[in-house]
Amino acid sequence: MSATALQVKTTQKPNSRLAVEVAVPAERCQANYEAAVTRLSRTTNLPGFRKGKVPRAVLLQQIGPVRIRATALESLVDAVWREVLEQESIEPLCEPELSGGFDALLESFQPSEALTLTLETDVTPTPKLKATKGLQAEAEVVTFDPSKVDELIEQSRKQLATLVPVESRPAAIGDIAVVSFSGTYDDDGSAIEGGSSDSMDVDLEDGQMIPGFVEGIIGMNLGDEKTVDCHFPDDYSKEDARGRKASFVINLKELKTRELPDLDDAFAQQSSDKATLEELRNDLEQRLQEDAKRRDRSNRHDALLEALTEQLEVDLPNTLVQQEIRNLVEQTASQFAQQGMDVKSMFTPELVRSLMESSRPEAEERLRRSFALTALAESEDLKIEESEISAKVKEVSRELSGERDIDPARLRQAVSDDLLKDKLLDWLEDNSTITEKVLESEAKTSKPAAKSKGSKTKSTKTKTNKANTEKPASDKSKS
């Protein structure tokens, strides 16, 4: 063994933390110290001496031995770490940390003596699955509901309706009321922040306002003033109002009703790009059927992924958890910005800390799902052929032909991840048992989303949409 060779001992710690103990020979320490002295003599400017010509004794006196030792130790630790990474094939997720800190190590560092130091870093964990086949899952079944076609058509009719003033009758469900109002809390009589308006349109439909508000307007005549008792829900957006009772003094200033367009071909042309009402209905039916298939497949895949994750054994590194938390907070900020909110003023340090704390469970769950897929691909040797990836990249590139700033490498990686995730979930579906369940909530179907390919049904399958966000974890990650 060379006199300058490093002796390395690695110890696995919790949270995928790796401790690396390194014994550095005295010869290596001395050589590094001498190199530091040489570098400092070349770069230090001292009065009366040319640059690079400062005598060693003068340099030690002017700079001081501690600074020189610190400079030598910094370069030594950096060089040792780079050599250890290559020697031990370690791929760190973050910068290393010195156990005990730099100052403590500096106190013990003597250039003429051997040095033992310990560096710690996070590394990518090796996920393992207790089982991959025969998993049991339960998923909510989603089926096409023909009545949703009529609901969507009625929504379009409302959007295209003509508002006609009403003067001869009281306010009724379905009307548009123009009101002024002011509200106070019942418990202390204080004014409700944002709880007043000189003129606001209120759609008199259930669920449009807090409980009691719309109900209180029903039956009022133009010019009437009425005090209405309301109750803020426990999950209301403003925390200080949650669960509190309130009173609103409401004045009915105007009342309008909707005059709906006739259900004919003219309506179809006005509300869509279809020429006839029959074409419109057929198009909506097709979109709703595709949406039901997409959501049903998403539910099955999400249930399967949940079942697979229950079989996972993995120690999540804090570096990846914090990175995923930041991603979630950034997504939240982006959503607020898209809604026109001032993110800079909203996202105070206190709010960011709160969001990061509350996002941790979701971040950990996302990572666990990603590692579960990674472990499945490794366990069952499931891969995507390069030809499949290339074909899909071409297809996506054509769809994005008008987009700018598309990174080909990132696009290819994203396509590869998506294809592999689909293949893994399809494999799971073929090798698992999924029990279907029908919930009453299925009656509340959302509007159709973008088209997606149909899914096969072999097994029988709970939850919605999480499976679309997880992809196999990358094999390698570096800081």
Swiss-Prot record:
GO process terms (BP): 'de novo' cotranslational protein folding; cell division; chaperone-mediated protein folding; protein transport; protein unfolding
Coarse class of the protein's main subcellular location: cytoplasm
Enzyme nomenclature, EC number: 5.2.1.8
Pfam families for this protein: FKBP_C, Trigger_C, Trigger_N
Transmembrane intervals: none
Keywords on record: Cell cycle, Cell division, Chaperone, Cytoplasm, Isomerase, Rotamase
Domain of life: Bacteria
Region (Disordered): 438-479
Protein localization: Cytoplasm
Keyword Cytoplasm: yes
Biased composition (Basic and acidic residues): 468-479
Molecular function terms, GO-annotated: peptidyl-prolyl cis-trans isomerase activity; protein folding chaperone; ribosome binding
Residues of the PPIase FKBP-type domain: 174-261
Composition bias, Basic residues: 453-464
An annotated GO cellular component: cytoplasm
Catalytic activity annotation: [protein]-peptidylproline (omega=180) = [protein]-peptidylproline (omega=0)
PANTHER family in alphabetical order: TRIGGER FACTOR CHAPERONE AND PEPTIDYL-PROLYL CIS/TRANS ISOMERASE, TRIGGER FACTOR-LIKE PROTEIN TIG, CHLOROPLASTIC
Role according to the record: Involved in protein export. Acts as a chaperone by maintaining the newly synthesized protein in an open conformation. Functions as a peptidyl-prolyl cis-trans isomerase.
NCBIfam families in the record: tig (TIGR00115)
Domain writeup: Consists of 3 domains; the N-terminus binds the ribosome, the middle domain has PPIase activity, while the C-terminus has intrinsic chaperone activity on its own.
Record-stated family: Belongs to the FKBP-type PPIase family. Tig subfamily.
Protein name, per record: Trigger factor
High-level lineage: Bacteria, Bacillati, Cyanobacteriota, Cyanophyceae, Synechococcales
Recorded name of the encoding gene: tig
